[in-house]
């Protein structure tokens, strides 16, 4: 089993705190409709562009989403 790129717990926390549906968040970030669910569930890892889009949208660093540091 391979390690996942993102810290799924942190990503779920950010997504839930946003208050919008996962689909709405994806649309605002320019991601595919179910991308966020796939990243949180561990079905797939985000591309670099998707990781940057999520960090920008949530106002955190990419390192935070990767589980490597503070916001």
Predicted regions and their residues:
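Short, charged recognition helix plus adjacent turn
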Residues: 1, 38, 56, 66-71
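A short, Lys/Arg-rich alpha-helix, primarily the initiator
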Residues: 1-20, 24
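Residues in the recognition helix of alpha-helical DNA-binding motifs
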Residues: 14, 28, 39, 68
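Alpha-helical residues within the helix-turn-helix
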Residues: 16, 27, 56
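Short alpha-helical DNA-recognition segment
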Residues: 19-38
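Residue-level signal for the short linker/turn that defines the boundary of a DNA-recognition helix
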Residues: 19-21, 46-49
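Key DNA-contact positions within bacterial/archaeal DNA-binding proteins
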Residues: 34, 44, 63
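DNA major-groove recognition helix of helix-turn-helix/homeodomain DNA-binding modules
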Residues: 49-64
């Amino acid at each position: 089993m391979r390690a996942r790129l993102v810290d799924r717990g942190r990503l779920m926390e950010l997504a839930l705190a946003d208050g919008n549906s996962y689909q709405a968040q994806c649309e605002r970030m320019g991601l595919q409709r179910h991308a966020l669910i796939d990243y949180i569930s561990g079905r797939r890892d985000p591309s670099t562009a998707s990781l940057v889009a999520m960090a920008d949208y949530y106002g955190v660093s990419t390192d935070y989403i990767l589980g490597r540091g503070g916001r």
